[in-house]
């Protein structure tokens, strides 16, 4: 026997004690405040790690991930054993309601909250999408005391986190409470704890730490066990196929039940493994020589070596080559699995399903007869291995049992964005937590952009007190805005709605003197009227002087009363002695006293509403540049005002490509994208003209720097451009190629996840959000 294995078995050997209570059946001897357990003669520590997009990666990316995972396995210390655990647990109902569902507010909008909650609840009442899949890595080592173990885990933990980071998986050391939660969720599924575990409080009260998570009863039979009212069974992988697909573990874990699968790994030092293989090879060669000698003695000089001997020789040589020339390591592996059900019949049915899945991969799962207790202690992430059905593997053959499948986006207190196509789990993201929460929604006409944005607006309006500002060039958001109690400001040359371009309060501008900020705005306004670069230095001086003079009475009155208008500014210009002032007045006459004077009068709409949609569809070509300037100025200063009182602002800009046609609005957007996070705001841009958007270098930069992107069905040319810009693989592009409305890819903080999102049609919210012309007629 290999020295490493015999030493490990000797260290792990314990005296058998008949458990007198449920607590005695839990094999943890001691716990420490930093999450270390003493189990048997060993100390163990657990890390959680996130999933990566392995299933939808391209062949090249899969190979790269496989090699990186192999490096992680090679980095495991041969003085310790490792356990990789995949835990499927059912979503906790109370936790789901607290973090995802919208609470009632008695503000007249609860009807919409109930509709939205009904849709969210329907997403998790099925089977597959009510399961959360978690991943853990537990390292166990024999040390003389906890301090030695602590030093060891500190060193090993750094290596593990680094290697998992190369795979784009985020590893995190589990605290004591987080680690105990794994066992509580397993033994007491769905039962809410009266209080979180606190080691000091438990010690003060004289309670045993096991009381917090152990079940009320545990019964072990020949081929199953019972935990309280639930049934469970531990299986192990008895026979391995010659070639196992990398999807094997993932398919085993697709069972829609509470399930835990563990892969125990005991690495062997390469020199020791090589010596063992050389000894084995020598034995094989000796057997071959003896067989050949016997054949020669019988005058059988043409006999070929028996197949089993030849195969043994070939496999031993190949494994020796793997170790000496291909940087492989020898490892002992063990795969165990426990699944739970509400009845014995369901348990037997699930076991047969798992057997069938294994047979499909030419492997054999078997039930641990009369070893259910030892099996349970092995599969749970205590850090123990009590089942000795070890299989000799290399790094590659261990790496095939890869625990990765599909990335999940499930952030607490986030907004719902659809369902993960691969895992069927909900996608819940919190843009507020991202380094840059700005977002684009890209897709051809009819792909579901507006619907997706409206669904996000509904959630923000119903679940927060944040302000929502919408720039609406296509008149698509009016009905929804009014239904949510907001204000629609329809701006055109012929409408009775007016917005005063010179509106200003004490909070105007960022952190500077409001009059300085307003002077810059007035200068930009006249550059739009006269032409960019056409305003001379003399004219700039006149404009600055007039801005100060026109606001003087208003400022002296403490920013109270009625602010001046462009008509007041026009009269002041006419009173200036310089001929340039008369030229400025004449150039601006059409937009101040003429027919296009929409922005030259006092504001006559509610610009303080919590939700505002600026409908600029009817502005026309002549008034559009000025309209954009005034509207964007109003939006920006609302953001600043909210920031000063500690309020968040969400901005939605439909057909954002239109803003890049005008230099001022393009520059404004770029500055807004860079600075809005500082002012507690988030911007979302929607467009179907991705090609036109990408012609702007500014837009490309904004797109690349946005941490949250929703990509729906794309045209062929747009797909190619986006793939280059955002590094999207061909496999992933398939999710934005000829797909139904509401389907596509979400990129959140660099993670790309395929999603689908359909809202129930028989709801009031759907009718408010739908932009389908045929549905609007209905």
What are these regions (language model features)?
Residues 441:
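Hydrophobic anchor at the beta1->P-loop junction of P-loop NTPases
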Residues 449:
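Conserved lysine of the Walker
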Residues 726-778:
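Conserved P-loop NTPase
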Residues 52, 59-78, 89, 253, ...:
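P-loop NTPase motor domains
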Residues 452:
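Hydrophobic positions on the alpha1 helix immediately C-terminal to the Walker A/P-loop
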Residues 459-469:
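Post-Walker A helix-loop "phosphate-sensing" segment adjacent to the P-loop in P-loop NTPases
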Residues 485-489, 698-711:
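A short helix-turn-beta junction within AAA+ P-loop NTPase domains corresponding to the substrate/partner-engaging
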Residues 1-404:
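Extended, folded cores of ATP/NTP-driven motor/assembly subunits in large transport
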């Amino acid at each position: 026997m290999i020295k490493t294995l015999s030493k490990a078995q000797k260290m792990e050997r314990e005296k058998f004690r008949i458990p007198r209570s449920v607590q005695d059946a839990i094999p943890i001897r001691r716990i420490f405040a930093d999450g270390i357990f003493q189990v048997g003669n060993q100390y163990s520590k657990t890390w959680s790690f996130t999933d990566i997009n392995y299933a939808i990666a391209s062949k090249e990316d899969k190979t790269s991930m496989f090699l990186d995972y192999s490096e992680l396995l090679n980095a495991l210390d041969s003085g310790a054993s490792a356990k990789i655990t995949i835990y499927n647990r059912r979503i906790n109902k109370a936790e789901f309601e607290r973090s995802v569902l919208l609470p009632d507010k008695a503000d007249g909008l609860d009807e919409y909250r109930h509709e939205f909650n009904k849709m969210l609840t329907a997403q998790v009442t099925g089977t597959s999408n009510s399961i959360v899949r978690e991943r853990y890595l537990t390292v166990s080592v024999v040390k003389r005391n906890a301090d030695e173990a602590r030093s060891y885990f500190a060193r090993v933990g750094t290596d593990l986190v680094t290697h998992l980071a190369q795979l784009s998986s985020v590893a995190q050391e589990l605290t004591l409470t987080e680690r105990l939660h794994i066992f509580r969720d397993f033994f007491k599924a769905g039962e809410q704890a009266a209080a979180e575990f606190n080691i000091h409080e438990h010690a003060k009260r004289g309670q045993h730490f096991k009381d917090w998570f152990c079940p009320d009863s545990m019964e072990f039979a020949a081929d199953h066990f019972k935990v309280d009212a639930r049934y469970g069974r531990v299986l192990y992988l008895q026979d391995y196929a010659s070639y196992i697909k990398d999807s094997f573990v993932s398919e085993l874990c697709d069972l829609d039940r509470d399930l835990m699968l563990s892969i125990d790994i005991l690495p062997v030092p390469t020199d020791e493994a090589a010596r063992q293989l050389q000894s084995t090879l020598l034995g094989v060669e000796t057997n071959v020589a003896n067989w050949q000698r016997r054949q020669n003695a019988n005058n059988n000089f043409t006999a070929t070596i028996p197949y089993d001997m030849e195969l043994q020789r070939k496999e031993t040589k190949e494994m020796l080559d793997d170790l000496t020339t291909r940087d492989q390591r020898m490892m002992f592996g063990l795969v165990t699995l426990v699944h739970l059900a509400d009845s014995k019949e369901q348990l037997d049915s699930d076991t047969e399903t798992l057997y069938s899945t294994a047979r499909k991969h030419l492997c054999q799962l078997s039930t641990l007869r009369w070893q259910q207790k030892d099996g349970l202690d092995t599969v749970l992430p205590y850090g123990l291995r009590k089942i000795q059905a070890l299989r000799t593997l290399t790094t590659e053959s261990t790496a095939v049992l890869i625990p990765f499948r599909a990335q999940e986006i499930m952030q607490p207190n986030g907004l719902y964005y659809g369902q993960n196509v691969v895992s069927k789990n909900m996608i819940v993201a919190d843009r507020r937590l991202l380094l840059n929460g700005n977002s684009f929604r890209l897709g051809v006409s009819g792909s579901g952009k507006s619907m997706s944005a409206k669904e996000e607006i509904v959630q923000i309006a119903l679940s927060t007190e944040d302000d929502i500002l919408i720039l609406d060039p296509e008149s698509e958001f009016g009905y929804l805005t009014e239904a949510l109690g907001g204000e629609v400001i329809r701006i055109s040359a012929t409408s009775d709605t007016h917005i005063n371009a010179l509106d200003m309060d004490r909070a105007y501008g960022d952190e500077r003197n409001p009059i300085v900020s307003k002077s810059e705005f007035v200068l930009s306004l006249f550059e739009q009227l006269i032409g960019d670069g056409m305003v001379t230095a003399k004219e700039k001086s006149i404009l600055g002087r007039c801005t100060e003079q026109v606001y003087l009475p208003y400022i002296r009155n403490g920013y109270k009363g009625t602010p001046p208008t462009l008509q007041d500014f026009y009269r002041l210009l006419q009173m200036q002695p310089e001929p340039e002032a008369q030229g400025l007045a004449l150039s601006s006459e059409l937009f101040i006293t003429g027919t296009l004077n929409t922005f030259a009068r006092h504001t006559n709409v509610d610009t303080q509403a919590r939700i505002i949609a600026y409908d600029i569809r009817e502005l026309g070509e002549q008034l559009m540049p000025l309209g954009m300037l005034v509207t964007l100025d109003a939006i920006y200063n609302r953001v600043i005002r909210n920031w000063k009182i500690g309020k968040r602002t969400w901005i939605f800009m439909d057909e954002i490509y239109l803003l890049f046609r005008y230099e001022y609005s393009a520059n404004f957007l770029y500055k807004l994208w860079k600075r809005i996070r500082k002012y507690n705001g988030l911007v979302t841009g929607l467009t179907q003209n991705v090609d036109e958007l990408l012609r702007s270098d500014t837009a490309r930069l904004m797109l690349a720097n946005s941490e949250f992107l929703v990509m729906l069905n794309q045209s062929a040319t747009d797909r190619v451009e986006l793939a280059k810009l955002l590094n999207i693989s061909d496999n992933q592009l398939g999710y934005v190629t000829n797909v139904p409305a509401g389907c596509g890819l979400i990129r959140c903080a660099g993670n790309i996840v395929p999603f689908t999102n359909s809202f129930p049609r028989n709801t009031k919210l759907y009718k408010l959000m739908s932009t389908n012309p045929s549905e609007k007629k209905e």
